[in-house]
Amino acid sequence: MLAKITRSSFYASRAVGRLSGSIPTSPAALASNCRYIQIERKRTKSHEMALYETVEKGAKNSPSYSLYFKNKCGNVISPMHDIPLYANEEKTIYNMVVEVPRWTNAKMEISLKTPMNPIKQDIKKGKLRFVANCFPHKGYIWNYGALPQTWENPDHIEPSTGCKGDNDPIDVIEIGYRVAKRGDVLKVKVLGTIALIDEGETDWKIIAIDVNDPLASKVNDIADVDQYFPGLLRATVEWFKIYKIPDGKPENQFAFNGDAKNADFANTIIAETHKFWQNLVHQSPASGSISTTNITNRNSEHVIPKEEAEKILAEAPDGGQVEEVSDTVDTWHFIHLK
């Protein structure tokens, strides 16, 4: 049976007392305020407290595998709907949910249709999906994930690209030095964006850096990426251009001739997708393609009691045989561009 709990690497930046203004002392107050519920936690060198943890269900490398999220109170949450977009709105610092760590191939993503939106591996034609290694790249070349509480609206034609949204949370690539873990929630600073046109849909790729990265104080906009990460933007465009070719698909196209837009432009796009998400999570009836079940958005008709969210986790498939990943996943593909 597999029900392993791991800890997020995203930590609170302030002590509990400063978060609340005052610390309740009565047992009733402590019980009613989730921020004071004591949970086992991993600490960084600065002894900051983890805000999120993950729970694995099902067998790894199988369709049953799911990675659920809990907040620091131990409540099951949706990483798409219950984790705030902003870690610090005043400083324009965002939360990023890591779906795919750097150098890995499994195409993991927030499951839009599954209640509480766990991370699952994408399946196509009955098989688990792995991203091909296109020479000279190995797997994903950055930490890859999504910004919570965003949604690229498929009914909206983006004026700057002329294409509709792709019906997903907005994607983000994190370029810092650390290889993150699946399910990590990072605080990131946005540097810019690339506009991938994937099968006729706008698929923004936000470029960001973990605020705890040693270079975070030096990179503040897209021009800084070329200075401190020379070659990375060029490699990023190449990666997105060719990564589907080994699967028999044509090379991807880009808006703006593949040029990256700056941080201000990216922040505007993020704000727009956040508004689309707000409409999504509050719309009635619920979207047929996306589960909007959540526990924190009180004005949403799709909010559920935390006990019901816990039941969803408890009823998720558990156990099973861990499956081996085929050696062919490590194949290097050499691409001839036309």
From Swiss-Prot:
Xref: InterPro entries: Pyrophosphatase (IPR008162), Pyrophosphatase_sf (IPR036649)
EC numbers, comma separated: 3.6.1.1
Listed GO CC annotations: cytoplasm; mitochondrion; nucleus; NURF complex
Binding site for Mg(2+) 1: D166, D171, D203
EC top class, as a word: hydrolase
GO BP term, pick one: regulation of hemocyte proliferation
Compartmental location: Cytoplasm; Nucleus
Binding site for diphosphate: R129
Cofactor: Mg(2+)
UniProt keywords, alphabetically: Chromatin regulator, Cytoplasm, Hydrolase, Magnesium, Metal-binding, Nucleus, Transcription, Transcription regulation
Reaction it catalyzes: diphosphate + H2O = 2 phosphate + H(+)
Entries under Pfam families matching the protein: Pyrophosphatase
GO molecular function: inorganic diphosphate phosphatase activity; magnesium ion binding
Residues given in the record as Mg(2+) 2 binding sites: D171
Gene3D superfamilies recorded: Inorganic pyrophosphatase
Other facts noted in the record for this chain: The ATPase activity of NURF is stimulated by the presence of nucleosomes rather than by free DNA.
Family: Belongs to the PPase family.
Entry function: Component of NURF (nucleosome remodeling factor), a complex which catalyzes ATP-dependent nucleosome sliding and facilitates transcription of chromatin. NURF is required for homeotic gene expression, proper larval blood cell development, normal male X chromosome morphology, ecdysteroid signaling and metamorphosis. Inorganic pyrophosphatase (PPase), hydrolyzes inorganic pyrophosphate to inorganic phosphate, essential for driving critical biosynthetic reactions including transcription, replication, and DNA repair.
Listed PANTHER family: INORGANIC PYROPHOSPHATASE
The protein's assembly and partners: Component of the NURF complex composed of Caf1-55, E(bx), Nurf-38 and Iswi.
Protein name: Inorganic pyrophosphatase
Source organism per UniProt: Drosophila melanogaster (Fruit fly)
